[in-house]
Amino acid sequence: MAMLNYDYGAMILNQLEAKRRIIKYLKEHNIPYMEGLCGDAPQITMLYKGCENCPDKVLESSIYFFSDCAECRVYYNANGAEWVRISNCRNDLFRLFNYINAMIWPCGADGVGNNLYKPQHLYTPRLYMTEDDCFDIVLATVVNYDFYNVAPLETEDFLTACLPELLNNLSIPIFLLLLGKITVERAISIIETEILDKRGTIL
């Protein structure tokens, strides 16, 4: 029987090609970015303006391209981190993070009425506070290059639209809790009634 000769090398996506594709997407969507290095890993940093619920109405994001995967982190600016640092309610914040990480499963969408692809739960980001005394609140997810190769547009939309939108939506309960204006129970109630449907999917 004749063997089919597939070129598996053509299907492999490495860190440099992944970075090239992301940059192409950012340029096409007019998303400002800067390039750099984190150790030996190429890095792209982006700024999202118009995030109405966030400190200074901005969010920042970095994508790190490691040898076997990429990691995307979305986080508040330095003023947001300062609010975390001076807060006396961080223990309550960690309880809220526990709820969010257990119950929220963001669903990526194309933003044009499902004409390009159907909504899917592609990635499972986690929300945490960094342990480096910077007090950053970070929403992070890991991207497998092979999966990115299979679902490129879905992945790019998720990293640059879905994740920032989710953190922006969570900002009101997060910072009201940090400022001592509401309880953990009230923060959870806000998320359940204004952000989630009954399946844990973003409204």
Q: How would you label these PLM feature ranges?
A:
Residues 1-24, 28, 74-97, 176-187:
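Long, low-complexity, intrinsically disordered polar/charged segments
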Residues 1-74:
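Charge-rich, low-complexity N-terminal segments
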Residues 50-52, 78-80, 143-147:
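Beta-strand elements of well-folded, non-transmembrane domains
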Residues 75-136:
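Short, internal acidic amphipathic alpha-helical interface segments
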Residues 137-141:
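Short, aliphatic-rich beta-strand segments
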Residues 146-161:
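A short acidic/glycine-rich loop-to-helix N-cap element
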Residues 158-177:
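A conserved amphipathic terminal alpha-helix motif
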Residues 175-203:
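Short, highly charged C-terminal tails/helix-capping segments
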